């Protein structure tokens, strides 16, 4: 009879630690190129902790300017030019603000949190009038809204405010003071078909001490009863912004015109504050 042949699998040996690629041995300019392909949050949270050399690269300007230079669109080129012009002087003990900027991506997106009430009243400072604020589904779709829900007011003025800290969102003072950015604000308001309503919007640009730098207000005519569940949009762009802006205060009011108990007042949703690079 034939003999049995053992076919036991031989385990693959572990690689020699010395054979593992050590990126720290790369020349700084080549390591910089490699790191520029790593996501910004990973650079800040992990790569920066590897060693002093990596920390110096992540804290420096060159890495982040390399990331920005990869966007060849007109907006990308405009941003790169603006960033180069208004970066603060490099300091060994202070990380380049472009790191937080690239990680948080504050330009071109809505900086208002919970704009449609999808999280209830979270992030808003509210003053309840009548029966107070509630959140309901939209009676008609609102274009571009992240959620088809809205904040609904009552028979007495209901107020709601959110203050956006622009530096906390990833912008830096020299960029805000450069004259190269503008602030676009927008709000949608409407009524239910069987009740008229009133609406107010107040947007204020504030400095670090909460002093007013610029402001905009909208006091449109009331929407009448039997209005086909209409929604209207209010927009404004702050351009040529004066130096010192650090906060945007966004506040709107609403109430009904029938003075009915319950929630028949102005319906507000899809509020937005967007910072963008001036193209002209």
Swiss-Prot record:
Coiled coil: none annotated. Detected in brain, heart and muscle. Pfam families: F-box, FBA. SUPFAM superfamilies: F-box domain (SSF81383), Galactose-binding domain-like (SSF49785). Residues 101-277 form the FBA domain. Keywords: Ubl conjugation pathway. GO terms for cellular component: cytoplasm; SCF ubiquitin ligase complex. Gene3D superfamilies: 1.20.1280.50, Galactose-binding domain-like. Residues 20-67 form the F-box domain. Signal peptide: none annotated. InterPro entries: F-box-assoc_dom, F-box-like_dom_sf, F-box_dom, F-box_only, Galactose-bd-like_sf. PANTHER family: F-BOX ONLY PROTEIN 27 (PTHR12125:SF9), F-BOX ONLY PROTEIN 6-LIKE PROTEIN (PTHR12125). Part of a SCF (SKP1-cullin-F-box) protein ligase complex. Interacts with SKP1 and CUL1. Substrate-recognition component of the SCF (SKP1-CUL1-F-box protein)-type E3 ubiquitin ligase complex. Able to recognize and bind complex-type oligosaccharides. This is F-box only protein 27. The lineage of its organism: Eukaryota, Metazoa, Chordata, Craniata, Vertebrata.
